[in-house]
């Protein structure tokens, strides 16, 4: 649980940290779309270069991103193996037995899927590590302003997102404390097969859910005591302003996007 870093903010002074949260949110969303548009090694080389440049600009250690990948590593490996073993025939066949078919195209596609997972996870991790949860909520509310014309509760949704992001690392820390307490009582969460390991997590889930409900109730009581009204319009302590660095970042991304489109049909 200590390796789970999604939702954590790492306060540093870097170009990425100073970017407008709206720019980072839109860029992250478009980045994921572009990742699925890439279909050759040159396209992925551009995406990798952009991602590495963003990580270096953020001044965040690579170890944090590896921690972000570790909890999802089993899902990545499982998906890659499925693609590798059960891909349709195409290119040179390296191994064939019954319905298992390892081909050249399957190997290439498995590699692409592996890189896609890594790029998306690393960019999502960079977004949360370099942006405070409140800034993410504020940026999202600003981007969703047009939805107010169709009576969508934008401020409420932004508040819910902010609270959810803020509580993710808190609940992970709580889960770590509960697991350590149960290990001290002799519980081994890594013993046995997959089913037995999943069953051993049941004593963890009950106190974790109780803790989550108690924290949610305490938070709602504190908000009501401070006069929070969901329907009231409120000003922002920090006004978002689009800076030159946001424009430059987007121009670099658009330049890479155009290059990927060119390589896609090359």
Swiss-Prot record:
Keywords: Cell membrane, Membrane, Transmembrane, Transmembrane helix, Transport
InterPro entries assigned to the protein according to its UniProt record, in alphabetical order: ABC/ECF_trnsptr_transmembrane (IPR003339), ECF_transporter_component (IPR051611), EcfT (IPR024919)
Main location class: membrane
Keyword Membrane found: yes
Gene Ontology CC annotation, any one: plasma membrane
Keyword match Oxidoreductase: no
Domain of life: Bacteria
Transmembrane segments annotated in the record for this chain: 32-52, 71-91, 107-127, 152-172, 246-266
Lipid bilayer topology: Multi-pass membrane protein
Recorded GO MF terms: transmembrane transporter activity
Listed Pfam families: CbiQ
Cellular location(s): Cell membrane
Family: Belongs to the energy-coupling factor EcfT family.
Described function: Transmembrane (T) component of an energy-coupling factor (ECF) ABC-transporter complex. Unlike classic ABC transporters this ECF transporter provides the energy necessary to transport a number of different substrates.
PANTHER family: SLL0384 PROTEIN
Complexes and interactors: Forms a stable energy-coupling factor (ECF) transporter complex composed of 2 membrane-embedded substrate-binding proteins (S component), 2 ATP-binding proteins (A component) and 2 transmembrane proteins (T component). May be able to interact with more than 1 S component at a time.
Protein known as: Energy-coupling factor transporter transmembrane protein EcfT
Organism the protein comes from: Levilactobacillus brevis (strain ATCC 367 / BCRC 12310 / CIP 105137 / JCM 1170 / LMG 11437 / NCIMB 947 / NCTC 947)
């Amino acid at each position: 649980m200590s390796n789970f870093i999604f939702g954590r903010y790492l306060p540093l002074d870097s170009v990425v940290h100073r970017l407008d949260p709206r720019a980072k949110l839109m860029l992250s969303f478009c980045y994921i779309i572009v990742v699925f548009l890439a279909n050759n090694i040159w396209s992925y080389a551009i995406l990798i270069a952009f991602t590495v440049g963003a990580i270096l600009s953020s001044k965040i250690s690579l170890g944090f991103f590896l921690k972000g990948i570790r909890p999802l590593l089993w899902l990545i490996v499982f998906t890659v193996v499925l693609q590798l073993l059960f891909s349709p025939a195409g290119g040179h066949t390296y191994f064939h037995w019954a319905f298992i078919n390892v081909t050249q195209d399957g190997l290439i596609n498995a590699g692409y899927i592996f890189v896609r997972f890594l790029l998306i996870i690393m960019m999502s991790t960079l977004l949360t590590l370099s942006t405070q949860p409140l800034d993410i909520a504020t940026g999202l509310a600003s981007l969703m302003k047009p939805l107010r014309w169709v009576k969508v509760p934008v401020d409420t949704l932004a508040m819910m997102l902010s609270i959810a992001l803020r509580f993710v690392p808190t609940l992970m820390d709580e889960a770590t404390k509960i697991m350590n307490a149960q290990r001290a009582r002799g519980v081994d969460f890594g013993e046995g097969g997959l089913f037995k390991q999943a069953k051993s997590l049941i004593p963890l889930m009950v106190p974790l859910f109780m803790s989550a409900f108690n924290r949610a109730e305490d938070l709602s009581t504190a908000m009501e005591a401070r006069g929070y009204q969901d329907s009231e319009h409120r000003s922002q302590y920090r006004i978002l302003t689009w800076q030159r660095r946001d424009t430059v970042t987007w121009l670099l991304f658009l330049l890479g996007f155009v290059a990927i489109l060119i390589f896609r049909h090359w």
